[in-house]
Design a protein with these regions (language model features):
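Residue(s) in the substrate-gating loop at a strand-loop-helix junction
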Residues: 140
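Substrate-binding pocket helix/loop in short-chain dehydrogenase/reductase
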Residues: 96-97, 101-106
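Active-site helix of classical SDR
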Residues: 120, 156
């Protein structure tokens, strides 16, 4: 479904974005990779080509709307009209709220929230006149439920969800055929936990259970191919978080108050490498898609399979039920 399509991916140099572009290469898409880290971008482009796709890199800081707009222009000049735009890029700070500096809050918000705004804006300016196209927002269970030590990131993810809902309703009002969908992710094993700006005493980690970036990437690409659903949840932990927040938010407050700080740290010392909030960590080194938690990470999710195959599953259950009723009726005769 994506063969020959022009697909833009922000945050494409590492982590989930890197895993996404590799899958797009396997689908023989024309992939535009946007990020700051040029070494990671170059390695990602090589992987796309090796997988069978076409790749072009467009170094840009998504927090700057001028750079995003210029990148979108360059994509259409070099690859053709943009069919799909996938927002993945983000940054964060791991620290208690009162230890985060104002400029760090501003920067996290500019990258993680406004980066999606500028990407969506650039995509819509090109898609709406053509009345076709797909925008995929990479979200998180933390778009529904805030946790300690990540107030800037959680606030940005909540903002993306509200922003996306607003834009979707405007597209529906205009009877536009442009689709916008959101994929809410669980904890993912990405390099971000090695390069995030952190003031914790120990090495930050995703809140278990942890999934490999390919699990997230497959769900994101699936959403790009099936954008009519307004939202996708990835992993049973994401579903449990969202449903739990709806049913018993106060209980989750108390639970996270007791467990949320320790569950986001290992017993190892804090990394001493570059923090990517201000400068790309992968400017001179390629980190790839995976972080430091391969041994503890799951490479598949039953919940994702059930979500993507619910129509076939329902049909199979209906067929089974019908057959059972028919057999029962036959026996009564």
């Amino acid at each position: 479904m994506l063969e020959g399509k022009v697909v833009v991916v922000t945050g494409a140099s590492g982590g989930v974005g890197r895993a996404v572009v590799r899958i797009l290469g396997e689908k023989r898409a024309k992939v535009a990779l946007i990020a700051r880290g040029e070494t990671g971008l170059a390695a990602g482009a090589t992987e796309v080509g090796a997988a069978g796709g076409t790749a072009k890199v467009f170094p840009a800081d998504v927090a700057d709307h001028r750079q995003v707009e210029a990148a979108a222009d360059a994509v259409e000049e070099q690859l053709g009209p943009i069919d799909v735009w996938i927002n993945v890029a983000f940054s964060s700070v791991f620290a208690p709220f009162d230890e985060v500096e104002p400029e760090e809050y501003e920067r996290t918000t500019a990258v993680t929230y406004l980066g999606y705004v500028w990407g969506t804006r650039a995509a819509l300016r090109r898609m709406r006149p053509r009345n076709k196209g797909v925008i995929v927002q990479t979200g998180s269970a933390l778009a529904y439920r805030g946790i300690p030590l990540q107030s800037a990131y959680c606030g940005a993810k909540h903002a993306i969800k509200g922003f996306t809902e607003s834009v979707r309703t405007e597209l529906l009002h205009a009877h536009s055929d442009v689709k916008i969908t959101m994929v809410q992710l669980p904890a993912v094993n990405t390099p971000q936990f090695d390069w995030v700006l952190s003031r914790l005493g120990r090495h930050p980690q995703p809140v278990p259970p942890i999934f490999q970036p390919e699990v997230a990437a497959r769900a994101i690409v699936y959403a790009a191919e099936h954008p009519s659903r307004r939202e996708y949840w990835v992993g049973g932990s994401t579903a449990a978080t969202i449903i739990g927040e709806r049913i018993a938010p106060g209980l989750i407050d108390r639970y996270l108050g007791k467990t949320g700080v320790n569950s986001q740290q290992t017993d190892e010392k804090q990394p001493t490498g570059v923090a990517n909030l201000w400068e790309p960590a992968d400017e001179d080194r390629d980190y790839g898609a995976h972080g430091s938690f391969d041994r503890r990470s799951k490479d598949r999710s039953l919940q994702v399979w059930l979500s993507q195959n619910r129509t076939r599953l329902a049909a199979a259950l209906l067929t089974t039920a019908t057959a059972a009723l028919a057999l029962r009726a036959t026996r009564r005769r």
